Amino acid sequence: GKQIRFAECGGHFALSLDGVGEGFAESKQPHTLEFKTMNDKNFKAMKNLGCKKSKPVYWAQCQIGMHLGDMDRCYFFAVNKNTDEMYGERIKRDRAVGNLLVSKAKNIIFSDTPPAKLNEDPSYWQCRFCSYFAVCHGCKVPEVSCRTCSHVTPEQDGTWSCAKGKPVVTCDEHLFIPQIMPKDFVVTDAGDTFVEYEDQDSGEIIRNENNSQAIFDGRMQNG
């Protein structure tokens, strides 16, 4: 009844399989199992195009599961939430893609700076539908968390360390990583405990020093 969990990068990156299946007519080898429900529109696209073309994110998830579980096939099963119609598809492992996706995750996790934008053009279709559009292309500030703080480092053993010696929880000494701030925020001064920005849109000088939540209240992505 429980999912099967695999982890990489010391535990910073993990994926849970819905199960492992055996006894398929097409192959006796074990398959990772991935179960999804979807609305009628997405389900019809899945039937017509298959998982890779209609839901590439799901397909990538299947590839990561096969990579971490060291299995060569995945059985992807979907249910139409509107009609209860079912769809099943056997997905073949692509070793190169699996390696690439896990390596990409590792690079992002242990990088000192966030990855580059998918596209510099805010009208690019994938950017417009991204949940972080307001941060990458707009004027919103990301949420306050240890992951967005300059003082915190993810360690290779799966732990987190804080340069301020704090427990790894959101605290009153949070300092945003400058590279994740809105594009109109230009750094004008910085030190070990602060970063000062000029908002190019309004001309306002904003000093991020302690208590980011209070300083940027109202500018947050979720605000």
Model-derived segments and their meaning:
Residues 1-12, 18:
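A short acidic/basic microdomain associated with nuclease active sites
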Residues 5, 38-40, 81-84:
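Short, solvent-exposed loop/turn segments at secondary-structure junctions
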Residues 7-8, 23-25, 80, 199:
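Acidic surface patches and DE-rich sequence motifs
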Residues 10-12, 26-28, 166:
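Glycine-centered tight beta-turn/hairpin loop motif at sheet-sheet or coil-to-beta transitions
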Residues 15-49, 65:
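Conserved catalytic cores of phosphodiester-cleaving nucleases, focusing on short active-site segments
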Residues 45-59, 64-159, 170-222:
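Metal-dependent nuclease catalytic regions and adjoining charged, substrate-binding loops involved
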Residues 162-164:
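SH3/SH3-like beta-barrel fold
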